Amino acid sequence: MGGRNFRYIALDFETTGLDLQTDEPIQIWIMEFDLNGKVLWGFQSLLRPVKKATELKSIVCFITKLSIQQLESAPRPEEIIEEIQWFFWEDTIIVGHNISFDLHFLEKFFPWLKRKTTLD
């Protein structure tokens, strides 16, 4: 990669379901790490869905172990932009399991994000 210093972050979302058209992120995890796998920095936040949290499928609460009350008091995605934007610099490589799923939600709910290099 040409001697450039790249940043590596792991990204993971919990969502209300698997459909990008109708579902929303309800939790985000971001971890920056070095080439040796040492975690340098991390961020985690619950996210309040646009839909009323009371409309969530009970299976979502069961799988994620998140309560409706936790989600109703969480920030909306646009309220955490300042806290997460520094993770996504031009030299950032995003890694994760099934990362395309997370990237689709990231790009929909954080549209300012430009496509970065990814590793799945």
Task: Tell where the protein language model's regions lie, with residue ranges.
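Short, flexible loop segments at boundaries between secondary-structure elements
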Residues: 119-120
